[in-house]
């Protein structure tokens, strides 16, 4: 996987991600995933590609007691995760490491969670086999990935604008968020790693931003798309961003009421057992 296609954030970008994008998008999917996975008191839970830790924190709050571990390859994301307070429940242990070679013994966890991360792994099958390995017999897997980009109108509007104003291929990173959209492919990957009782639930969340302008601004500041414009001189950058905002705002006019943007976002949620 090319460097630009990896979900890599550092320093202030990770802080912006936690401050703005987690409340707007990620926490909705995190709550849905944790509800479906239903972690129980006393269980050992692993959150793979934990980012700034929203899934791990929600799981810990639900459990009350047990063990929760967050794993991510990104130092900046983990720094933010460690800096945030945890609520009720067990202390969360944060580990830096790859999902392709997890630093845990076999049969360590009762439940493995992975929210919106599998599509970014350079070897998805290896990552799933690692999840299988670290689960106890009959252990549970719960993961989510975005479906087709057309099922998230704001993302589709953004990639079209990026390619129009920054050249073909500028949207590759954003499009990669939706690169595991085929439910049949997803099923075969999970089953092929050894999991059984595999079910896929396709569901939708309504995502809100103060405006289309704010959606674009955050996408170009708190995600890997920031690299597309960060090296430009200020005048050129501002003109490009204004043009992208104009196109996205026009495309999303039907999703805007009183200036506020609200659009549907669809994802596949997978539940399975070892």
Walk through the language-model features, giving the residues of each:
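Conserved Class I S-adenosyl-L-methionine
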Residues: 3-7, 14, 52-54, 178-274
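Class I SAM-dependent methyltransferase Rossmann-like catalytic core
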Residues: 11-24
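Conserved alpha-helix/loop element of class I SAM-dependent methyltransferases that forms part
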Residues: 23-43, 58
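A generic alpha-to-beta junction signature in SAM-dependent methyltransferases
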Residues: 37-39, 62-63, 128, 135
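Class I SAM-dependent methyltransferase SAM/SAH-binding core
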Residues: 44-102, 111, 125-126
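Short SAM/SAH-binding signature in class I
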Residues: 46, 108-116, 267
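A short SAM/SAH-binding and catalytic strip from SAM-dependent methyltransferases
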Residues: 110-124, 147
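Conserved catalytic/acceptor-binding region of the Class I
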Residues: 125, 132-211, 226
């Amino acid at each position: 996987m090319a460097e630009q296609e990896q979900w890599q954030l550092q320093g202030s970008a990770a802080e912006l991600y936690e401050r703005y994008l987690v409340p707007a998008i990620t926490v909705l999917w995190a709550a849905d995933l944790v509800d479906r996975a239903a972690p129980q008191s006393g269980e050992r839970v692993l959150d793979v590609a934990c980012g700034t830790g929203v899934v791990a924190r929600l799981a810990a709050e639900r459990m009350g007691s047990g063990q929760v571990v967050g794993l991510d390859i990104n130092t900046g994301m983990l720094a933010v995760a460690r800096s945030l307070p945890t609520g009720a429940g067990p202390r969360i242990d944060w580990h830096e490491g790859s999902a392709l070679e997890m630093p845990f013994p076999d049969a360590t966890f009762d439940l493995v969670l992975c929210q919106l991360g599998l599509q970014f792994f350079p070897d998805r099958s290896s990552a799933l086999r690692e999840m299988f390995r670290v689960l106890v017999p009959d252990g549970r897997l719960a993961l989510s990935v975005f479906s087709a980009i057309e099922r998230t109108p704001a993302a589709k509007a953004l990639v079209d604008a990026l390619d129009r104003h920054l050249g073909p291929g500028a949207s590759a990173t954003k499009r990669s968020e939706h690169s595991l959209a085929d439910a049949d492919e997803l099923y075969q990957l999970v089953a092929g790693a050894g999991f059984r009782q595999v079910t896929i639930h396709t569901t939708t969340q309504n995502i809100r931003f103060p405006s289309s302008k704010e959606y674009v601004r955050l996408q170009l500041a708190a995600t890997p798309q920031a690299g597309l414009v960060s090296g430009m001189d200020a005048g050129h950058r501002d003109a490009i961003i204004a043009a992208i905002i104009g196109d996205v705002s026009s495309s999303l006019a039907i999703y805007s009421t009183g200036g506020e943007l609200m659009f549907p976002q669809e994802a596949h949620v997978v539940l399975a057992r070892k």
